[in-house]
Regions:
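Short N-terminal targeting/anchoring amphipathic segment
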Residues: 48, 62-80, 93
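A short beta-strand/loop micro-motif in the catalytic core of glycosyltransferases
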Residues: 74, 119, 136-145, 190
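Conserved donor-binding/catalytic core segment of Leloir-type glycosyltransferases
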Residues: 180-198, 204-207, 220
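Active-site proximal beta-strand in glycosyltransferases
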Residues: 72-74, 86-116, 141
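Membrane-proximal helix-turn-helix segments that form the acceptor-binding/catalytic region
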Residues: 57-64, 100, 116-140
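Carbohydrate-associated surface elements
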Residues: 146, 168
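A conserved catalytic-core segment of Leloir-type glycosyltransferases
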Residues: 2-57
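Nucleotide-activated donor-binding/catalytic signature segment of Leloir-type glycosyltransferases, i.e.
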Residues: 218-223, 229-248
Length: 248
């Protein structure tokens, strides 16, 4: 994060397996003597995503030593079990952008491969913890009305516990610039992740149809395209390689 020099940043240690070339072999055997490290290593190498769980265990150990130094604890959607401990000790706010269970539903709908569906469910196994914790939190911040409805329905969270704080844009940084020449028939969209939930399929299919009416139309996507992923395959299928650009 980009912090003021006076703000102290405490980095929570982990095995960092997702950053390594081999999640299985690139580990010092002595690190696995720690039970939590061993759990993380086994979980990742069996298709799980243990980071929300392991983060909670590690953050509790660190913060508990100096709990009096903290005025407020703000969780950004880890929804770890340890939040229920902190909630009894300090003012706690949790931001939930959207329930990840919706991602899982859309991903399951995007394939007929039974084995792949099992892997998807395995990766999202942390949702059991997140659903348990979310409904027991006293105050949750959400970024939109649709997120509020989704969290209420997916996680069974009381609407009165949620507060809408809409996403904003710094107009000192982002504003129309008359010096920049407008490109006719260019569309711009934002996709924070290359996953079915973001709905890029519908936009790309619509673009394919609009070419017949607007031959000069193009699409710029602010986001990263997953190499060899579903979106890349769809762009090739619709013959849109020269019409679509990604910027990240």
């Amino acid at each position: 994060p980009d912090l003021d020099p006076e703000i102290k940043l405490v980095k929570i240690p982990s095995l960092g397996l997702y950053e390594k070339k081999s999640k299985f072999f690139d580990v010092n055997p002595t690190e696995l003597l720690n039970p939590l490290n061993l759990f993380e290593w086994l979980s990742v190498n069996s298709g799980g995503f243990p980071e929300p769980y392991t983060f909670g265990k590690r953050i509790k150990k660190i913060i508990k030593k100096n709990l009096d130094e903290y005025d407020v604890i703000h969780d950004n959607q880890s929804l770890a079990y340890e939040l229920l401990f902190f909630q009894k000790k300090k003012p706690l706010i949790t931001t939930i952008h959207h329930p990840i269970s919706k991602d899982l539903k859309y991903q399951l709908q995007s394939t007929d491969d039974f084995f792949l569906k099992l892997l998807m469910r395995r990766w999202h196994s942390f949702l059991v913890m997140q659903k348990f914790v979310a409904k027991r939190l006293k105050k949750i911040v959400v970024p939109s009305n649709s997120s509020l409805e989704d969290i209420k329905n997916e996680f069974q969270v009381d609407e009165n516990k949620m507060e809408r704080v809409m996403n904003g844009i710094d107009l000192k940084l982002f504003y129309p610039d008359s010096k920049i020449k407008k490109i006719p028939f260019r569309l711009v969209t934002v996709a924070s992740a290359d996953v079915p939930l973001k709905g890029l399929d519908y936009l790309l299919e619509a673009l394919s149809d609009l070419i017949k009416v607007y031959p000069d139309i193009s699409l710029s996507i602010i986001g990263e395209q997953r190499k060899g992923g579903h979106t890349e395959r769809l762009i090739k299928k619709l013959n849109l390689q020269k019409r679509v650009n990604f910027f990240s």
